[in-house]
Amino acid sequence: MRGEGIRARKALGQNFLVDRHVLARIADIVDMRPDDRILEVGPGKGALTEMLAHRCARLVAVELDTRLVPVLRQAFRDNPRVEIVHGDILEIDLRDLLAYEGGERWKVAANLPYNISTPVLFAFLDNRDLFSRLVLMLQKEVGDRLAASPGTKDYGILSVFFQLHFDVTREMIVRPGSFHPVPKVDSAVLSFVPLEKPRVAVGDEQYFRRLVKGAFSMRRKTLWNCLKNAGLGLSGEQLSEALAVCGIEPGRRGETLSLDEFAALSRAMMALGGK
């Protein structure tokens, strides 16, 4: 077995996916074509890499664990389509890593460690123009938040930000027994297809993000109270006016607002001088 004797490191959030049926299903969800370019994050011992490598034109796998890099390079030494990159995905410039491939968009396959999933998600979000499809395995709780609808307990910042720019699909649940060592929680595989343009116009996206973060900053508080203290450049009176223009009751909670309502509110607040 490849990498036999190398134990998962808790500090790296490692849980190696060992279920061949789940691995095959993930490879199918990636939906590869012979000319596709694949970025794999966290290949581990290379089980998924092996299934992907013979179905695409090129595969770049980024692995942080210094013990696994030589194992992976040895395993794929005879496959010129595979490149193993030693590094931290959070510190690598994705544009530098992938841009030399002639501008073609990449597909992503990743089993994200639970402890870094959110910052990696935002790295993908902010570089979304590089990708045509992402297939990510995440802690189920994070997956639920990404795909949540307004008014549900899981709906929040991740839901709004990602649904603005991606079609997000829950693909499958992966039980703990599919991993070694066995984690304490379920995982979920989700696919993300970047939209050609945002689902709705938000005006200045940085302002929109600050607004959304403010709206979810105190879930027990009303929307008006959350936004009043969010540093968005409006007085309480102006905030009330913006909410009225959008037909949004100031006593609502942030988690009840749809993406369209957040976008309309962002535009209205900026029109009144929000900054």
Curated annotation (Swiss-Prot):
SUPFAM superfamilies: S-adenosyl-L-methionine-dependent methyltransferases. Specifically dimethylates two adjacent adenosines (A1518 and A1519) in the loop of a conserved hairpin near the 3'-end of 16S rRNA in the 30S particle. May play a critical role in biogenesis of 30S subunits. It is found in: Cytoplasm. CDD domains: AdoMet_MTases. S-adenosyl-L-methionine binds at residues 15, 17, 42, 63, 88, 111. Its EC number is 2.1.1.182. Belongs to the class I-like SAM-binding methyltransferase superfamily. rRNA adenine N(6)-methyltransferase family. RsmA subfamily. It comes from the Bacteria. PROSITE patterns: RRNA_A_DIMETH, SAM_RNA_A_N6_MT. GO terms for molecular function: 16S rRNA (adenine(1518)-N(6)/adenine(1519)-N(6))-dimethyltransferase activity; RNA binding. InterPro entries: KsgA/Erm, rRNA_Ade_diMease-like_C, rRNA_Ade_Mease_Trfase_CS, rRNA_Ade_methylase_Trfase_N, rRNA_adenine_dimethylase, SAM-dependent_MTases_sf. This is Ribosomal RNA small subunit methyltransferase A. Its main location: cytoplasm. Keywords: Cytoplasm, Methyltransferase, RNA-binding, rRNA processing, S-adenosyl-L-methionine, Transferase. NCBIfam families: ksgA. It comes from Geobacter metallireducens (strain ATCC 53774 / DSM 7210 / GS-15). It catalyses: adenosine(1518)/adenosine(1519) in 16S rRNA + 4 S-adenosyl-L-methionine = N(6)-dimethyladenosine(1518)/N(6)-dimethyladenosine(1519) in 16S rRNA + 4 S-adenosyl-L-homocysteine + 4 H(+).
